[in-house]
Amino acid sequence: LEKLLSSSSSSSGSSSPLDALGGDHSVNKRDTFDHSCKGIYDRELFRKLDRVCEDCYNVFREPKVATECKSNCFVNKRFNVCVADLRHDVSRFLKMANSALS
C-alpha cells in the first residue's frame, strides 16, 4: 500500500497506480468454480452444468436452489431434481457431473 501511495504522489510518470504493484496479478480461471471439482478443468462442461443450476433457479426463484445445485461439484440430490424438472436427459447430465468431480 505504501508503494502505491508513494507512486501516486511522486512525479515518476507511472501510467497507472496498478503499474506500481508489479505485473504478477494473474487470476486463476478455475477460481470461479467450486473447488470441490477435482476433475480435468473443462470450461464447456462447467458451463453446461452451471446452466442447469441457473435455469433451475429461474424456475423456482429461491436463492438456495442455485447454491445447493452447484454444491459438491454438481453431484447432489438438488442437481438431479433440477435436471429432471428441466426435462433434460438425466443419465447424460449425471455422467457429466461425475466426470467434473473425478
Swiss-Prot record:
GO terms for cellular component: extracellular region. The lineage of its organism: Eukaryota, Metazoa, Ecdysozoa, Arthropoda, Crustacea. Its main location: secreted. Residues 1-33 are annotated as: Disordered. Belongs to the arthropod CHH/MIH/GIH/VIH hormone family. Inhibits Y-organs where molting hormone (ecdysteroid) is secreted. A molting cycle is initiated when MIH secretion diminishes or stops. InterPro entries: Crust_neurhormone_CS, Crust_neurohorm, Crust_neurohorm_sf, Hyperglycemic, Hyperglycemic1. It is found in: Secreted. This is Molt-inhibiting hormone-like. One of its GO terms (biological process) is neuropeptide signaling pathway. Disulfide bonds join 37-73, 53-69, 56-82. GO terms for molecular function: neuropeptide hormone activity. Residues 1-30 form the signal peptide. It holds the Pfam family Crust_neurohorm. It comes from Penaeus vannamei (Whiteleg shrimp). Residues 1-16 have a biased composition (Low complexity).
